[in-house]
Amino acid sequence: MSLVETIKGHFDRCVISKYEGSSSKHPIIYLNSIKNIIGDDKNQPSTILLKALEKIANQYPKREDDQELLDQVAKDGIGLTVFISDLIESCENHDYKRMEKEAARLQLVSDNGLSGFEILIEIALRDFNRLGLLAYHLHRAMNFNKEIVGIWHYARCIIIEIVKKKLPNYPENHDIIFDLDNNIYSNQIETLTSAHRLWNIDSIRKTGFAQKISSWLSTHESQTPPFDDDKTNSEFKVYSKNGGRFFIEIAETLIDSPNKIVELESLRYLTNNASPKHLSYISNRIMSLIK
């Protein structure tokens, strides 16, 4: 089995987990973060990180009724028309059963299976503080070596997380330019980088994503830089210019600390996407993780 197939298998197993914890701590966030770090050396993938993927993907029991639900909706009849507004309305009314049914109907009529899933991701972004981090990582996990037959499992995963709390009122649209460098000093670095990636993502719902993100960003406050030291770690400096195994080796030491792994992966994203003037700040944040 190839590296890509192995990782996708762990993703597929993870999203059918019976997970009852906080949405912002969902194991798929941890798994996709590890996958991104593994990508720094695909020719010699880290054994430690691959073993962690398998362990985390299988730590919760499976849901067994995803296909049964889809089959039942098909059996009952899809109907002559399927409206996106029906799914949105069911989410706003916190009507879990109807929400599953409308999402299943969209799944069944969609040529590529994406329509319902993308709408659910957009709906989740209305509660960006709670669901933004998960929405990004779940979206990327689904699109990694995408198979249409498995999309319903990812859709049901986000449905289960959405309904854990009532959604806030529909957010206002804000005319905002997302400047990553102006927001980089954040105490929500994982959420910030998820927002930036979703802002620039290739999606049929990109406009809707941006509208939800702009509302969150309008309330986001950048913090005072927490480090006075302007020194940059020498190995990190080499990575910033040439790539390499810098983040892989740090991740191996932090592998039993999911929160630190997710933050580390966010700092990796900043390394590759923020202005070089922030490298000392990023370096200091990385070093603070391993102290």
Named regions from a protein language model:
Residues 1-291:
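Mature, well-folded catalytic/scaffold domains that follow N-terminal targeting or propeptide regions
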